Amino acid sequence: MYIAFEGVDCVGKSTQIELLKKCFKDAIFTKEPGGSELGVHLRKILLESKMQFSKKAELLLFLADRANLIDIHLVQNKNKLIISDRSFVSNMAYAKFDFDQNILFDLNSFATGGFFPQKIVFLHGSKELIEQRLSKKNLDSIEKRGVEYFLNIQNALEETLEILKTKIDIKILKLDASLSIENLHEKIKEFIND
């Protein structure tokens, strides 16, 4: 089973994934971007570089990472539990302001070969929560875009998930990121085991 965690920065995806590593020791854990050697380099370029990219170039770099990760690492483990920090859903949500959703879905279908998550854990945060957590960290180039940007992305994630429910067989668990870490963890484990 392939499970992806979605949500904007600072909603606790990484925290929950770290907790799951203790419960599901045989699972494959990955992230997008950066789940493969190519992805590590692309992530560094995209998030830390001072280089400027066109929106189309940025989209294609994310797609290249996804294609490589899925073809080389995930498909061969498709019969295992795979847990990913982000997936094509983020790509579609982040790019929806610049590209048609149908084109984005088709590009992601091509890049993934149709290998999509069966379950999505969507962590949703309030403006106050995101603001508070962003203020406590060193920001990368995307995080520097600010709270309003992340609220727009969060709305785009929700819209994208609604669209995807009509296109692919997917189960979605939406959780309030302000719940306690333990409460979130229990709900997520139950969803995975269901």
Swiss-Prot record:
PROSITE patterns: THYMIDYLATE_KINASE. GO terms for cellular component: cytosol. This is Thymidylate kinase. Its EC number is 2.7.4.9. It comes from the Bacteria. The gene is tmk. GO terms for molecular function: ATP binding; dTMP kinase activity. One of its GO terms (biological process) is dTTP biosynthetic process. Belongs to the thymidylate kinase family. The keyword tRNA-binding does not apply. Gene3D superfamilies: P-loop containing nucleotide triphosphate hydrolases. Keywords: ATP-binding, Kinase, Nucleotide biosynthesis, Nucleotide-binding, Transferase. It catalyses: dTMP + ATP = dTDP + ADP. NCBIfam families: DTMP_kinase.
